[in-house]
Structure formats: structure tokens, C-alpha cells
Amino acid sequence: MRPPGDAMPCPVCRAAGTGRFLGIEDRNYWRCPTCEATFLDPAQRPGPVEELAHYRHHENDPDDPHYRRFLSKLSDPLLAALPPGCRGLDYGCGPGPALAAVLTEAGHEVQLYDPFFHPDRQALDQCYDFITCTETAEHFHHPAREFDRLGGMLKPGGMLGVMTCFQTDDARFADWHYRKDPTHVVFYRAATLAVIARQRHWSFESPAKDVALMRKPG
């Protein structure tokens, strides 16, 4: 664990000058003043065994209408922006890739990748018209590196759709259900994702709460 005042580069935007934000029980959180990300002290991130054990408790049935409705916050605006017959990647799809099923039913081809449940690294060597990242970015141990990777897999003009619960008031952070998930190690605001997009010269819009659509230049 880093001593108080020992700053580190932001893992989201790589800016210097992050500072300690809040200590809650045995977990210490840092804040970046540049992109407004909040992140868990890197020394306290869970290991892969702990992560997998937690993920196995997730019950995301691809046929569950309630789960599909939840995902529609991203799928609806993404589908409205895509031309017919695109090829995409569901990055961090988990054990029940419901979003991929929705997009496939809409006429698109969707590859799957998840480091635990669909670890097909060949999927990472291809380029796509769109990439979705739903309920995944909060698990990133190295967010800047991950967004660089995602951008590298997008074709010119390709779209990245991100869905993660945006942090709101700092006063609510300690009791926030999203923070209490032990595998959630980084928290974004809409402004955070706007910085991520701007650094890579992508366009940015947030068509719904907790959703961002970014487009790589054509």
C-alpha cells in the first residue's frame, strides 16, 4: 500500500497528480483531478482466483427479458447508429453473452471475448466495426491500456459502446452498491469517458445514463 501523499499516475488517463480520495474499511481509493476517475489502490486489487470465484455467482441469462431490457440502454442507441451487417466484438462478455445475442438477432455478426469465460485470444487479433464493453470497464486493472487495445481493434469509423454505472455524488460513494463489489476497481463519470475519447481523437456522446458511445475517426 502506498503511504499518504505518495502520488501515482492515473491508470485511466495517465495524468500525474492523483491523490488519496477516501479510505473505507481496508480499501483505499484514489481520485484523478484530470479525468475525475476514482480507483482502488492497485495493491488492493483482487487476484484472478478471487475474481473468477465472484464472477461465477453472476446470473446473466441471455434469454432473460429483464436483463435484455437493462442492456437496451446501450443496444438501442448502438443499433440505431450501425449500418446493416456489421461485425463486432463483445469484449468482457461473461458467461452469458446476452448483448451479443441481441445484436446477432438484429443481423450483426458478433465475436466473443472474456479472459475467464471466452478466452479466445484470436478474437483480439482482428478488427471490428463495433465493440461493446458492458459492465466490464469497472473491472479493468489497467484502463488506459485496455482502451488503447480496444481502439486498436476498431476499424476506421468504428464504434465503441461502453456501459458502466457512473459515479455521482462523492457523499454517496462509501455506501454505493457498485463500490461494494470486490471486483470493481475503477469508477467513471461521463466526464471520465469523454477524456478517454478526447485523448484518442474519438467522438463522444452519452445517449443514456451510464452509457457512452465513442467513434474512431474514419
Question: Model-found features: residue ranges?
Answer:
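Short N-terminal helix/helix-N-cap motif within the alpha/beta-hydrolase-1
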Residues: 141-145
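Conserved N-terminal segment of class I S-adenosyl-L-methionine
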Residues: 1-130, 134, 147, 163, ...
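A short glycine-rich, Lys/Arg-flanked "PGG" loop and its adjoining helix->strand segment in the class I
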Residues: 147-156
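Low-complexity, intrinsically disordered Gly/Pro/Thr-rich segments
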Residues: 189-202
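Residue-level detector of anion-binding/catalytic polar loops
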Residues: 109, 159, 203
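A short His-aromatic
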Residues: 135-139
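Short, glycine-/aromatic-enriched active-site segment of Class I SAM-dependent methyltransferases
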Residues: 163-186, 191-192
